[in-house]
Amino acid sequence: GGLLKKARELAILCDAQLGVIIFSSSGKMFEFSSPPISMREIIDRYQKLSGNCAPVYDNQQVYCEITRMKNEIDKLQATMRHFAGEDLTSLTMNEMLQLEQQLEISVNKVRSRKEQLLQQQLDNLRRKENMLEEQNRELYRVIQDHHAASMEQKMVDPSMLDHFGVFYQDDHQAARSSMLQLSPQLHPFRLQPAQPNLQDANLLPHDLQL
């Protein structure tokens, strides 16, 4: 309040055109311009004299710029429809040839990009295949090592086999001796014609006596 009062007094005493803009700590704005001019006129005069004039656009210039941008957008949309195979009846022969060439160029670019992606996928699959083969070989090696270790554990030391072989031979001989002792003693029995018992008549049946 006091500052604006001082501004009024200064404008009257100095017969000057004065403009004051104040922003309080709460964000409120206060302004004063010495009559009969307004704050807008003071700001415009300041910009002209200081060279900080804001660009002023003519309405016709703005309209022309908007029209140009709209035409550009319409042309781009029409081109997109032509690439999609739409609204082709409005095209001339030369425009159709140009469109065909552009489509061929686009197709070649798409095909090249597709082949590039396929090659990348193929390279990735080959790398995965090599990794799987390496893992398979490593797993096979581990299995072979484990199998060899198991076979070594099952094998017996040859010196131990010789030691057990002596006991086996002794037991076999002992069993054989026992079988010989238990078998009956068979003596040969020979018939002697001169033996008296074979010539004793009493031993013959009565019906065979002469």
From Swiss-Prot:
It is found in: Nucleus. InterPro entries: MADS-box/MEF2_TF, TF_Kbox, TF_MADSbox, TF_MADSbox_sf. This is MADS-box protein AeAP3-2. Residues 59-149 form the K-box domain. It comes from the Eukaryota. GO terms for molecular function: DNA binding; DNA-binding transcription factor activity; protein dimerization activity. Signal peptide: none annotated. GO terms for cellular component: nucleus. Expressed exclusively in the carpel. PANTHER family: SERUM RESPONSE FACTOR HOMOLOG.
